[in-house]
Amino acid sequence: MVMYIFIFFLLIILSKLFTKKYTNNICFIILFIFSAIRFDVGWDFQVYYSLATKFDYLKYSIFITKSETLLKINQVWEKELWLYFVMEPLNKVLYKVGWFLKSPQLIIGLYSFLILFFIKKGLDYKKKKDYEIWLFFYSFPLFYFHSLSTMRQWVAISIIFFSYKYIENKKILKFILCVLIAGLFHYTAFLLGILYFISYLNLKKEVLVFLFFISFFSKGFLEKLLLLDLPVIYKYKVYILTSIGKGGKIIFFLIILLYLGILIISYLDKKFYEQNKNAIIYTCFGCFIYIALIDFGHLGPRMSEYFIIFILYFLDDTEKVLKKKFKIKKYIFILIEFLLLILLLHVDKNHIVRSQLVPYEAFFLNKDKTFHKIIKQGE
């Protein structure tokens, strides 16, 4: 846990040592290095890394039909081979680079760079240069630490986050291009084309209040909807069958508080809502998805991340409203983010199946490249 706490304070200290215009670069570099050199950190790390060691897979094509896939799998059954065949095309490109250079750790570095690069570019566009935004990104359970596990999806999420500039500037072709690229990292991103059209709805705050209340009573309708063979979603039905653990339940209550907090602040300051309308709507819609789909395994939480990430665009304005209305000091926000981090690490350390974060380990300190985070019970 010490390493994670060290990084938290390092983000603060180094950001304060330099002028504000360097904040995004500093935080990007710190989190990139911390992510890129990790070993066996992240729930799915072992799967990603194991595939990256299969240098002989370089011979396989990026584009392969379903029948060819089944034929190859029948000839040589390997879990990693199946994963390669079914993953999205741009992920295969990254793996081929790693295999060509015979560097398994490179794939971790490439994913880490892409995720944080597009987050940084999005913040640069909006001229958001506050280290507290990065602290929130680092400490909030659904963001940075999830990106250490679901790397493919988080590249897609970060690209969608970056595409917000094209929504604001009404550049639909560039937005569509971003969605297409994101979808080639994770197919669920194709569904995010809806963001562009939501921006034209001009939703009132009352609609967000309505969504908050019905999110607790949508189970029956959504259950029938998810059981249909909907485009893209049908590929991820397995997540509907996967139960949410203790950590997911804690995040559930955090999301409720987050949604309520955004609504309250929106009513306290009309200018706040008007200036950040699209980002607020997307974030609240993400909260709605998380709350409404909490009983359906991991599908809801994972889809909600595409939307909730937009909170980074108005986090500093939220702080300004709270300072103005309630005279809350800056250190209170930092304390809350620190407590979120401690809570996250505590839950992870005591996970009933396997810790994904604790302890932190760098790849150059693990000479034999052995996975140490063993399963405590049947996963």
Question: Where are the model-predicted features located?
Answer:
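Alpha-helical transmembrane segments and terminal signal-anchor/GPI-anchor hydrophobic tails
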Residues: 41, 46-50, 55-64, 84, ...
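Start-transfer (signal-anchor) and selected internal transmembrane alpha helices
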Residues: 1-31
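Membrane-embedded helix bundles of polyisoprenyl
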Residues: 132-150, 154-161, 188
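Transmembrane-helix signature of polytopic, membrane-embedded enzymes
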Residues: 22-26, 123-140
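Short hydrophobic/aromatic helix or loop-helix immediately within or flanking a transmembrane segment
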Residues: 46, 50-54, 64-100
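Membrane-interface transmembrane helices that cradle and orient dolichyl/undecaprenyl
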Residues: 160-173
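Transmembrane-helix motifs of polytopic, lipid-linked glycan transferases
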Residues: 109-126
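Signature aromatic-anchored transmembrane alpha helix within multi-pass, membrane-resident enzymes
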Residues: 210, 323-344
